[in-house]
């Protein structure tokens, strides 16, 4: 019987839930927002809202907190836009959003997964150099107790929020490993979430996966890319499958390291105002490049793929991307909360807006219909190469394409 499991890398972060950053975000300082056209908040609407509030207070079956109603009202204004990418963030959720995009968290540096039936929690991944790794935690360890509580009686999000709260100077865990109890004490600290993974493949081919475009992605990419070049990589595969996007600044700073001089991406708002993001072209890539994409490659990942394709510096392999060609801006409201809304469209260097369409690969390779798709690409790219290629037909084709490009260049 297949067991149902949920996983949360936020244990490292101490965040309560995973916050998907499916769109590029800008962060702006709080200021006065001009009113354009007729205001929704008038004496008439305020009076109606007050009347509804009184009816709820008097007649609703259960007691309702006024703060909860207010939060729902704010959220409703954004929900009325009918835009899945626009929304209201309470103070708590805005903090989580910011932490997610920054890629840095207060935590101990590991991911965990919980069996939804037995509630057993195991260590899924222990980040290199993290407090957890230094304390001796290993992947596969069963978390038996957290402090003085049984881990199986807690939810992953509860543990995560507890770490994030900063209420503890150190965290005591009892682990089960091969039937033996192991006690470790860990001091939470700022942990940078690893979002770039790399390795060398046979035939001097380099592989680099980008899971998400956070603030830390450009520097992590730089280190990994430089290391692959030191190992004499003659070609490079950049894997963007299942990458939901992230920060516009992050993807631009990453592309700056491989593109020639020219346009990376530009945006236009409803008034026709255009903002361009360009590359100086100081370090254009000089080896053959393959970019691996799928239907879950979205937003900033599509900016990356679109720029590579339009500049003709690489070959796209996989399936058509998600098709998110719009940009959101986040406005802090001064009290810790914020609103995020769609403010512009983005265009690839050749002037293409891919919203609702996606980017088609140069070489299409669909995942087998009779085979489950991996939740995380890193579940496969840490396998021995031969086993990996046997399980991953898209990666296998990428290696074939890249090998051909390298051979062609060497002629």
Predicted regions and their residues:
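Intrinsically disordered, Ser/Thr/Pro/Gly-rich linkers and terminal tails that flank
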Residues: 1-114, 145-146, 151-200, 212, ...
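Acidic surface patches and DE-rich sequence motifs
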Residues: 115, 269-271, 333, 348
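Short, structured beta-strand/loop micro-motifs enriched in basic residues and often containing a Trp
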Residues: 120-127, 382
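Cleft-lining beta-strand/loop regions that shape enzyme active-site pockets
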Residues: 122-125, 133-139, 147-150, 157-331
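Structural motif
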Residues: 140-142, 337
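Hydrophobic beta-strand signal
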Residues: 144-145, 340
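Conserved P-loop NTPase
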Residues: 328-333, 339-374
């Amino acid at each position: 019987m297949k067991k149902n499991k949920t996983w949360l890398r936020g244990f490292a972060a101490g965040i309560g839930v995973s916050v998907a950053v499916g769109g590029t975000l800008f962060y702006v300082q709080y200021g006065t927002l001009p009113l354009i056209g007729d205001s929704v908040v008038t004496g008439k609407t305020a009076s109606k809202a007050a009347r509804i509030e009184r009816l709820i207070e008097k007649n609703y079956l259960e007691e309702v907190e006024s703060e909860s109603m207010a939060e729902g009202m704010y959220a409703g204004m954004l929900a009325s836009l009918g835009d899945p990418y626009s929304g209201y963030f309470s103070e708590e959720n805005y903090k989580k959003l910011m932490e997610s995009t920054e890629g840095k968290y207060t935590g101990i540096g590991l991911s965990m997964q919980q069996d939804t039936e037995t509630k057993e929690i195991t260590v899924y991944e222990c980040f290199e150099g993290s407090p957890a790794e230094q304390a001796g935690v290993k992947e596969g360890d069963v978390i038996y107790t957290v402090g003085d509580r049984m881990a199986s009686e807690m939810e992953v999000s509860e543990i995560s929020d507890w770490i994030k709260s900063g209420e503890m100077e150190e965290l005591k865990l009892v682990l089960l490993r091969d039937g033996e109890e192991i006690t470790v004490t860990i001091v939470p600290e700022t942990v940078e979430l690893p979002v770039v993974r790399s390795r060398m493949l046979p035939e001097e081919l380099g592989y680099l996966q980008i899971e998400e475009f956070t603030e830390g992605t450009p520097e992590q990419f730089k280190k990994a890319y430089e290391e692959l070049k030191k190992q004499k990589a003659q070609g490079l595969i950049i894997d963007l499958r299942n990458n939901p996007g992230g920060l516009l600044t992050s993807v631009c700073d990453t592309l700056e390291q491989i593109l020639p001089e020219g346009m990376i991406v530009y945006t236009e708002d409803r008034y026709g105002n255009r903002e361009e993001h360009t590359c100086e072209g100081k370090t254009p890539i000089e080896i053959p490049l393959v970019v691996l994409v799928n239907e879950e490659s979205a937003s900033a990942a599509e900016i990356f793929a679109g720029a590579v394709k339009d500049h003709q510096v690489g070959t796209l392999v996989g399936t058509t991307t998600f098709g998110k060609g719009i940009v959101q801006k986040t406005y802090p409201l001064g009290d810790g909360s914020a609103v995020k809304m769609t403010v512009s469209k983005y265009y690839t260097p050749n002037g293409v807006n891919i919203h609702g369409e996606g980017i088609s690969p140069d070489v299409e390779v669909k995942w087998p219909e009779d085979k489950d798709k991996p939740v995380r690409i890193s579940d496969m790219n840490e396998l021995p190469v031969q086993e990996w290629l046997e399980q991953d037909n898209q990666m296998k084709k990428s290696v074939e394409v890249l090998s051909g490009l390298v051979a062609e260049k060497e002629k």
